[in-house]
Amino acid sequence: MARLYDFYKDSVVPELMKQFGYKSIMQVPRIEKITVNMGVGEAVADKKVMEFAVGDLEKIAGQKPVVTTARKSIAGFKIRDDYPVGCKVTLRRERMYEFLDRLVTIALPRVRDFRGVSAKSFDGRGNYNMGVKEQIIFPEIEYDKIDALRGMNITITTSAKTDEEARALLAAFKFPFKG
């Protein structure tokens, strides 16, 4: 079992039950999935770029990403329908907790001038979005072997009904919020 999942069962659940007055442990919010998305607009000009992006995301997530394609043609961006424009990976269960553990304990502290993540990035339904400017903050990526710095979006989907519950859940996982 993942270290963070055991921590969730043993520490987070009782803490949140007491804080919000839940009657059952099934009412306690939990993290359902983490989606890591990497937009690769440069792939339109050079197909090799997509292979590098997929490789990087696979190393970071430990799972093979799905290549996302353009839904419709846009002449201004020189993209056609079904052109590869990015890749994403959806993590659940064990891999999700391992990724969250690495993100909070290793990757985020390696960001330059890091002061914490914004607490305003909740969507109103208990989900959290954050952006990472460069993939080299993850220890799995070797600095010498990358072709370009690429950012990514990380979406944490929770079963929380409100942003307040979701924030309490992530804070219990030692998520580094500002202030």
From Swiss-Prot:
Family: Belongs to the universal ribosomal protein uL5 family.
InterPro entries: Ribosomal_uL5, Ribosomal_uL5_bac-type, Ribosomal_uL5_C, Ribosomal_uL5_CS, Ribosomal_uL5_dom_sf, Ribosomal_uL5_N
Keywords per UniProt: Ribonucleoprotein, Ribosomal protein, RNA-binding, rRNA-binding, tRNA-binding
Subunit organization: Part of the 50S ribosomal subunit; part of the 5S rRNA/L5/L18/L25 subcomplex. Contacts the 5S rRNA and the P site tRNA. Forms a bridge to the 30S subunit in the 70S ribosome.
GO biological process, one term: translation
GO CC term, one of those recorded: ribosome
PANTHER family: 60S RIBOSOMAL PROTEIN L11-RELATED (PTHR11994)
Function, in words: This is one of the proteins that bind and probably mediate the attachment of the 5S RNA into the large ribosomal subunit, where it forms part of the central protuberance. In the 70S ribosome it contacts protein S13 of the 30S subunit (bridge B1b), connecting the 2 subunits; this bridge is implicated in subunit movement. Contacts the P site tRNA; the 5S rRNA and some of its associated proteins might help stabilize positioning of ribosome-bound tRNAs.
Molecular function terms from GO: rRNA binding; structural constituent of ribosome; tRNA binding
Name of the protein described by the UniProt record: Large ribosomal subunit protein uL5
